[in-house]
């Protein structure tokens, strides 16, 4: 039987851990079991305890102290160590077959753009552990205040889609921080990035910078791969429910579930009679 896993990616501070916690809370509320697998050797504890924590194998703080490395070099060392000890990950995942595993990944994008760390882990999960995987990439909504920054983030999302070669869902997180300043009509323009968003900006930025930003926006548009789903974890779970439905669709979660046998006898409460 295949397993289902979701990789949560994105720059530091975009709300990956909050999204993981919201996913767990919502899935528990509808009777589905899920677990967080922490792949960030520098992560702090969150609301929901990590079922599997890479810090049990190696932590960034220990590496920085013992190897005299900086944060980025230490993180690369940690993941190279993990790649050499994937049997530890296999043992920790063990018999989690019919439950969601949510992989909370570190925010350093060089782990999948510059060195093939995450792509290697993805291939291992697929081939050795029979996972159906989906990648989610979070970009925080305040990026839309600066259109050039938004398209830079969209380019990072697209690079993750291409390099990981997984079904991919992009998420515009922290939407509650901008929904009072932007109408729904304005926000929809960012959910499906359009280079025309830069038209009003060209008059007051450096011409060379404007040309570079326009080229990035056109590249994102030419590929036609990047769209975003809005995420608001502040009040209700409707956006989480919507995102989970997309994840279920691309991972074919429902098709992987074993059919449940009906009960032979149905007990009716006394008040029925």
From Swiss-Prot:
A motif (Gly-Pro-Asn (GPN)-loop) lies at residues 70-72. GO terms for molecular function: GTP binding; GTPase activity. GO terms for biological process: mitotic sister chromatid cohesion; protein import into nucleus. The record marks 72 as: Stabilizes the phosphate intermediate. GTP binds at residues 13-18, 173-176. Pfam families: ATP_bind_1. Keywords: GTP-binding, Hydrolase, Nucleotide-binding. Gene3D superfamilies: P-loop containing nucleotide triphosphate hydrolases. Small GTPase required for proper nuclear import of RNA polymerase II and III (RNAPII and RNAPIII). May act at an RNAP assembly step prior to nuclear import. Heterodimers with GPN1 or GPN2. Binds to RNA polymerase II (RNAPII). Belongs to the GPN-loop GTPase family. This is GPN-loop GTPase 3. It comes from Candida albicans (strain SC5314 / ATCC MYA-2876). The lineage of its organism: Eukaryota, Fungi, Dikarya, Ascomycota, Saccharomycotina.
């Amino acid at each position: 039987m295949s397993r289902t896993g979701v990789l949560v990616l994105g720059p530091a501070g975009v709300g990956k851990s909050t999204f993981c916690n919201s996913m767990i809370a919502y899935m528990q509320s509808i009777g589905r079991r899920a677990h967080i697998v922490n792949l960030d050797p520098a992560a702090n504890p969150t609301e929901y305890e990590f079922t599997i924590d890479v810090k049990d194998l190696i932590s960034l703080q220990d590496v920085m102290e013992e190897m005299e490395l900086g944060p980025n070099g230490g993180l690369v060392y940690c993941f190279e160590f993990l790649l050499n000890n994937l049997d530890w990950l296999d043992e920790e995942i063990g018999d989690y077959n019919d439950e969601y595993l949510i992989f909370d990944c570190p925010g350093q994008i060089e782990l999948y753009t510059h060195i093939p760390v995450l792509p290697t882990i993805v291939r291992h999960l697929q081939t050795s552990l029979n996972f159906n995987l989906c990648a989610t990439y979070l970009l925080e909504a305040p990026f839309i205040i600066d259109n050039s920054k938004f398209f830079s983030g969209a380019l990072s999302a697209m690079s993750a889609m291409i390099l990981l070669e997984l079904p991919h869902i992009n998420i515009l997180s922290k939407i509650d921080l901008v929904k009072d300043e932007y109408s729904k009509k304005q926000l929809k323009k960012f959910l499906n990035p359009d280079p025309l968003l830069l038209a009003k900006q060209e008059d007051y930025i450096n011409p060379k910078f404007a040309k570079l930003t326009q080229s990035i926006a056109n590249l994102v548009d030419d590929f036609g791969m990047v769209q975003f789903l809005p995420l608001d974890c502040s009040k209700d779970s409707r956006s989480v429910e919507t995102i989970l439905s997309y994840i279920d669709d691309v991972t074919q979660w429902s098709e992987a579930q074993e059919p449940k046998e009906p009960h032979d006898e149905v007990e009716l409460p006394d008040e029925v009679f």
